[in-house]
Amino acid sequence: VILERGADVDTRQADVERFWETGKLQPDSNVQFGEGGAGTFSDGKLNTLVKDKFGRNTEVLRTFVRYGADPAILYQAKPHIGTDVLSRIVKSMREEILRLGGEVHFHSQVTEILTEGGHVTGVKINAAEELPCEQLVLAPGHSARDTFSMLYENQFPMSAKPFAVGFRVEH
């Protein structure tokens, strides 16, 4: 079961286009939130980790190809798939999850993690519906500060990851 706080990628694309045209922001369906995450509307450049001696990104690239990316990304030094292709790939991945019997629920923000005796027992969705579970993978993505606040307030252990700052010089 996948719970996505934002909209599906097609609805999200329309919401993003409307934002660029009118300035009307949909809080949970925009460049940051929705199916595919913040990277869906990036320029489609892929970090290949070509110098990684463990080849950890190879399977990710193969997965992109399996769902519609150009096979050239498997050997290009600086692969690029583009936002238009990435959106189709994200949708194809969702369709495969559904075909295999999985579930994807949009506009379903995890607002509480339910526990008993120190173990996860479920989640509360949109502060209303409860979904039982024994295991939980929480992937809040970019800009989900309210999710981190909820974790902090409920004393879930967290640790900061290394922080990197970069900049681009164009000439």
Which role fits each region the language model picked out?
Residues 1-45, 49-171:
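Residues forming the flavin
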